[in-house]
Amino acid sequence: MKTFNIKSPDQAIHQALIDRINNLAKPEGSLGMLEELALQIGLIQQTLSPRLRNPHNIIFAADHGIADEGVSFSPKEVTWQVINNFLGGGAGINFLCRQHGFELVLVDGGIDFDFPEGLDIIDRKVRKGTRNYLYEAALTGEEMEQAVTAGAEVVSDCHHRGCNVVSFGEMGVANTSTSSMWMSFLTGIDLKDCVGAGSGLDSEGVRHKYNILKQAKENYKGNGSTEDVITYFGGLEMLMAVGGMLQAAELGMLIIVDGFIMTNCLLAASQFYPEVCDYAVFGHCGDESGHARLLEYMKAKPLLNLGLRLGEGSGAVCSYPIIVSAVSMINEMHTFAQAAVTKYF
């Protein structure tokens, strides 16, 4: 797999950031997670005056062979149909990106559809969907490496355009199934606790989904390594997000993590480079079964809990105003001396 150069942020500035935050005209700790965020972002950017520039939400999209087993509420063609809605500006993530000032980047990583030329979508298609991992490996090692590299290159391009904060979204029918497989293998959590309704399965549908995934897990004869698991089960959009997150960390960008699927991508990325988590903020706890358990496993503190289960980066983008507030706090609040206020705690 592509190698990355990721280091934890230098801690030399840590105490100066703490002093700066504690000398703002407020009781120490009274702005809670805003203070934690300001510290984290200051460390990432190595400055007492951090700035957020040109935020991007990157949506990687691809199809999954396991969708042929009826594990999703939606048929496979919904993947490309939703992408068309993104392109038309009418999806949930479109209005959120407009509202919060994000540039939306769409990437075809492996959709089982041929889009006409000239659309505002980046073509990094590795193949038309993954193979059905109920019966065989979803991807080859070479295809996995292509996907990780493609995701990294998309993020590098965003960085070259002045972006220093990035969120990731996804679109791919049946990708909650693949995420459940990643979660169970990479955490050791029982598969039943990792499987949920996805885009809208009823209880019978969830039962069928679990039974299919349980059989797929039993059929897997790999070595159980992170690289083997994410190759065997795919999917292409998730692997691109892994590469994108690792590249963002290498470039010192702030990563806003979305829901169940993107949290699994960060989990996988952290198995290779644990330091990637130093650059990540968890936007929200989603409504997909397994997400809260996964966040707990990763000792994550999500900023929001709104019952979202849309994906697309929606929860990450919704959380952005809180991150902006943290940066505004450290840059705009007066110190006790500037405010001529006696330090009252």
Curated annotation (Swiss-Prot):
Pfam families given in the database record: DBI_PRT
Domain of life: Bacteria
GO MF term set: nicotinate-nucleotide-dimethylbenzimidazole phosphoribosyltransferase activity
Pathway: Nucleoside biosynthesis; alpha-ribazole biosynthesis; alpha-ribazole from 5,6-dimethylbenzimidazole: step 1/2
Enzyme Commission code: 2.4.2.21
The reaction(s) this protein catalyses: 5,6-dimethylbenzimidazole + nicotinate beta-D-ribonucleotide = alpha-ribazole 5'-phosphate + nicotinate + H(+)
UniProt keyword list: Cobalamin biosynthesis, Glycosyltransferase, Transferase
Entry-linked SUPFAM superfamilies: Nicotinate mononucleotide:5,6-dimethylbenzimidazole phosphoribosyltransferase (CobT)
Active site (record annotation): 312 (proton acceptor)
InterPro entries, per the entry: Nict_dMeBzImd_PRibTrfase, Nict_dMeBzImd_PRibTrfase_bact, Nict_dMeBzImd_PRibTrfase_N, Nict_dMeBzImd_PRibTrfase_sf
Single Gene Ontology BP annotation: cobalamin biosynthetic process
Protein family per UniProt: Belongs to the CobT family.
NCBIfam families per UniProt: cobT_DBIPRT, PRK00105.1
UniProt function note: Catalyzes the synthesis of alpha-ribazole-5'-phosphate from nicotinate mononucleotide (NAMN) and 5,6-dimethylbenzimidazole (DMB).
Protein name (Swiss-Prot/TrEMBL): Nicotinate-nucleotide--dimethylbenzimidazole phosphoribosyltransferase
Source organism (scientific name): Porphyromonas gingivalis (strain ATCC BAA-308 / W83)
Upper taxonomic lineage: Bacteria, Pseudomonadati, Bacteroidota, Bacteroidia, Bacteroidales
